[in-house]
Curated annotation (Swiss-Prot):
This is Hsp70-Hsp90 organizing protein 1. Expressed ubiquitously, with maximal expression in cotyledons, followed by shoots and flowers. Keywords: Acetylation, Chaperone, Cytoplasm, Nucleus, Phosphoprotein, Repeat, Stress response, TPR repeat. Residues 142-181, 521-560 form the STI1 domain. Co-chaperone that forms a complex with HSP70 and HSP90 and preproteins (e.g. chloroplast preproteins). Interacts with HSP90. One of its GO terms (molecular function) is preprotein binding. Residues 192-253 are annotated as: Disordered. A motif (Bipartite nuclear localization signal) lies at residues 241-258. The tetratricopeptide repeat (TPR) domain, forming a carboxylate clamp (CC), mediates interaction with the highly conserved 'EEVD' motif at the C-terminal ends of HSP90 and HSP70. It is found in: Cytoplasm; Nucleus. Residues 198-210 have a biased composition (Acidic residues). TPR repeats lie at residues 2-35, 37-69, 70-103, 244-277, 279-311, 319-356, 383-416, 417-450, 451-484.
């Protein structure tokens, strides 16, 4: 559905119907709100309609969803350019070019932003009035305006309008601003709060009287100084941030050289210059981590998380700080033997950003915790006692109770093959065949020479009517214990069942059950889907001479035997 709406939007955009394109892209976004391409397309449509504020919002959303996509910054730059924010447009295009230095659209946009920034602003009476060098002097020369300049709020308003004449529209209801524009444009602007007597009085004032008013010596200079101080403060902030970045780069270089003390010095200096970038804290934490100063690392990470939330920093940065803290806690846990705090922090980091590296560290911490618990619980003597209790209960046919004791024995000694063997026997008695098979295989894995493992596994497979597999298991066991009577009896029982199948001695119900079970076996499925075996089976029915040749092929006969054992094929 979202793709359909997107296609309609693209078609409308191509046809020049940008309003319709916006509607279609909005419909698509409602269906797929995390699709960055849809926001990008709608941003372009808004920009084509000269709705640059909406275009900017969509472009910013595109960047948030896909920060590594160069086109997102092309959209962002175009929106800023439409709003005449040349510096922001320049920054957006530069960021995009860092991702894709050869992108023609970004290069063109950057050139447009540079040209627009250097182009003189369009002249208008308001722009000229507010940008003139004598603005403050002319206002001071007027008695009413001079009185208004005593109010810092009014001075701030006039400074804002001087920086951006378009802000004049925000203050149309302010009598002081209207009077000031009248003074600067040399026109008479009547304000609603003046009554007729005021107009008459103003009309009676002569030009000489206006000129003869004493001019203050300091008010305009003070206003200009305020503006200059603010600009100087902004410049100083930019300079400090730039110096902080240089310190960070120097710290990174020292870190790569394993010069940790120097790296810490640079990161600390960066923090002094700019406390609004938490990467300085996380980088210093990384150095402390390498040095084994885990407590210092944790402190920096906690500061980074706290400061990051205050600044509403990127959630990825906060997640990075949490992951680094978790790593320090995990390393400390090797001594403290408490992995729970590290696990908790890793889980918290994953809620901020599901990062594969963090997930890997969480799994490692959980595994280490489990291994530690097993080490602390390990006691072969208690394991033997639990196994003996299980044996007594097994003899009493109390299989569920016996299973619990065998499980306890395994926890106490995970390497005890006998405990797995005995629990497999319990599971078989209880009809829990998959669990019994798993324990029997674990028993064989721990001790391949232990014949009980093979008898347990064979018994489970025999109970599951997988006679050919049980036969293979018993034969494998005989390799380690050739005279084991239990294994020999198992082989005899399997052969009887296989012969019974080949003679077709099963009841229809038994045959149907065996065939249904066999069809679930991937090996049986593979044999039946093999074109060569399909032809072989056909030859056995229709071409006796060809069948004689097939009988000489051991691989073919092995597969035929599997089908016979499964009840799929019967020999008559």
């Amino acid at each position: 559905m979202a793709e359909e709406a997107k296609a309609k939007g693209n078609a409308a955009f191509s046809a020049g119907d940008f309003a319709a394109a916006v509607r279609h892209f909005s419909d698509a976004i409602a269906l797929s709100p995390s699709n960055h391409v849809l926001y990008s397309n709608r941003s372009a449509a808004h920009a084509s309609l000269q709705n640059y504020a909406e275009a900017l919002a969509d472009a910013q959303k595109t960047v948030d969803l896909k920060p590594d996509w160069p086109k997102a910054y092309s959209r962002l730059g175009a929106a800023h350019l439409g709003l005449r924010r040349h510096r922001d447009a320049f920054s957006a295009y530069k960021t995009g070019l860092q991702l894709d230095p050869d992108n023609a659209a970004l290069k063109s946009g950057l050139a447009d932003a540079q040209a627009a920034a250097s182009r003189p602003p369009p002249t208008s009476p308001f722009a000229t009035a507010f940008s003139g060098p004598d603005m403050w002097a002319r206002l001071t020369a007027d008695p009413t305006a001079r009185a208004n300049l005593q109010d810092p709020e009014f001075v701030k308003i006039m400074q804002d309008i001087q920086k951006d004449p378009n802000k004049f529209n925000l203050h149309l209801s302010d009598q002081r601003v209207m009077h000031a524009i009248g003074v600067l444009l040399n026109v008479k602007i009547q304000t609603p709060n003046h009554d007729e007597n005021d107009h008459d009085a103003d009309d009676d004032v002569s030009e000489d009287e206006v000129v003869s008013q004493p001019e203050p010596e300091h008010e305009p200079e003070a206003a200009v100084e305020v503006a200059e101080e603010e600009e100087e403060e902004e410049k100083e902030t930019r300079d400090r941030k730039g110096q902080a970045q240089k310190e960070k780069e120097a710290g990174n270089a020292a870190y790569k050289k394993k010069d940790f003390e120097t790296a810490i010095g640079h990161y600390s200096k960066a923090l002094e210059l700019d406390d609004e970038d938490i990467s300085y804290l996380t980088n210093r934490a990384a150095v402390y981590l390498e040095m084994g100063k885990f407590e210092d690392c944790i402190k920096d990470c906690e500061k980074a998380v706290e400061r990051g939330k205050e600044l509403r920093s990127d959630y990825k940065m906060i997640a990075r700080a949490l992951t680094r803290k978790g790593t320090a806690l995990a390393k400390m846990a090797k001594c403290s033997k408490d992995f729970e705090p590290a696990i908790e922090i890793f889980q918290k980091a994953l809620t901020e950003n599901r990062n594969p590296d963090t997930l890997k560290k969480l799994n490692e911490a959980e595994k280490a915790k489990k291994e530690l618990e097993q080490q602390e619980y390990f006691d072969p003597k208690l394991a033997d006692e639990a196994r003996e209790k299980g044996n007594e209960l097994f003899k009493q046919q109390k299989y569920p109770e016996a299973t619990k004791h065998y499980t306890e024995a395994i926890k106490r000694n995970p390497k005890d093959a006998k405990a797995y063997s005995n629990r497999a026997a319990c599971y078989t008695k209880l009809g829990a065949m998959p669990e019994g098979l798993k324990d029997a295989e674990k028993c064989i894995e721990l001790d391949p020479t232990f014949s009980k493992g093979y008898t347990r596994k064979g018994a489970v497979q025999f109970s599951m009517k997988e006679y050919d597999k049980a036969l293979e298991t018993y034969r494998e066991g005989l390799k380690h214990d050739p005279n084991n009577q239990e294994l020999l009896d198992g082989i005899r029982r399997c052969v009887e069942q296989i012969n019974k199948a080949s003679r077709g001695d099963f009841t229809p119900e038994e045959l149907k059950e065996r065939q249904a079970k066999a069809m679930q076996d991937p090996e049986i499925q593979s044999i039946l889907q093999d074109p060569v075996m399909t032809q072989v089976l056909t030859d056995f029915q229709e071409n006796p001479r060809a069948a004689e040749e097939h009988v000489k092929n051991p691989m073919v006969m092995n597969k035929i035997q599997k089908l016979i054992s499964a009840g799929i094929v019967q020999m008559r």
